[in-house]
UniProtKB/Swiss-Prot annotation:
Pfam families: FeoC
Similarity-based family: Belongs to the FeoC family.
GO molecular function terms attached to this record: DNA binding; iron ion binding; iron-sulfur cluster binding
Gene3D superfamilies: Winged helix-like DNA-binding domain superfamily/Winged helix DNA-binding domain
Job of this protein: May function as a transcriptional regulator that controls feoABC expression.
Coiled coil location: none
Matches recorded under InterPro entries: FeoC, Tscrpt_reg_HTH_FeoC, WH-like_DNA-bd_sf, WH_DNA-bd_sf
Protein name, entry field: Probable [Fe-S]-dependent transcriptional repressor
Keywords annotated in UniProt: DNA-binding, Iron, Iron-sulfur, Metal-binding, Repressor, Transcription, Transcription regulation
Residues that bind iron-sulfur cluster: C56, C61, C64, C70
């Protein structure tokens, strides 16, 4: 089980990561990592970075049957 400090330190080392990557690296369930990231965000220590839909190569993200599943969400330290 990872701690909040370990999540923060990992973000400091790797500059930005997805929640799934953090979960896999720290061998911690993703819902726990999501909660920790939200806590870091509320403390003003981390920021959520979302890709813009105009970054889609095919330009069809808006009509994609998966919704916005192709848009990635990154986390970084503030």
């Amino acid at each position: 089980m990872a701690s909040l400090i370990q999540v923060r330190d990992l973000l400091a080392l790797r500059s930005r990561m997805e929640a799934a990557q953090i979960s896999q690296t720290l061998n911690t369930p993703q819902p726990m990592i999501n909660a920790m990231l939200q806590q870091l965000e509320s403390m003003g220590k981390a920021v959520r970075i979302q890709e813009e839909p105009d970054g889609c190569l095919s330009g069809s993200c808006k009509s994609c049957p998966e919704g916005k599943a192709c848009l990635r969400e990154w986390w970084a330290l503030r």
